[in-house]
């Protein structure tokens, strides 16, 4: 934390910080309490987005198969609809959690992007893993339960 604050103090052009060192909400709060000219973004797949927003983060910068959901959460929160933002966030948490599985996050996200027409191929280069049939079935089940297009 001190290093980030020292860097920000040394160079006035450094105004935006992306936090990915857990726990992000209290760290964001401490950074912003020390320097209110900073803009802090969360990361880590959006897992702590609501808590980061509550601590003063301006948004998140992360990969996610449905980025429009994260945009909706941030817009609601920033417009004053904190309850609506929280409801959307908690409704989507199972997908955020599922997509953030270590080593599987990129193949899961690429499969979602392919199904949504954003990319042509979901293949992950070596040494990245491939998704097994069970993981794909779990993803399909989750997307169906959330009412999100899976194909």
Would you name each region that the model predicts?
Residues 62-64, 80-85, 106-109, 140-146:
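Short, structured secondary-structure boundary patches
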Residues 59, 79-81, 113, 120, ...:
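Short alpha-helix boundary/capping motifs
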Residues 71, 90-93, 107-111, 137:
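A generic structural signal for well-ordered alpha-helical surface patches
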Residues 1-93, 98-101:
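Catalytic alpha/beta core domains of metabolic enzymes, predominantly
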Residues 53, 94-126:
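Conserved short secondary-structure transition element at the edge of the structured enzyme core
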Residues 37-41, 111, 128:
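Helix-coil boundary/capping segments in enzymes
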Residues 118-151:
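Flexible C-terminal active-site loop/helix
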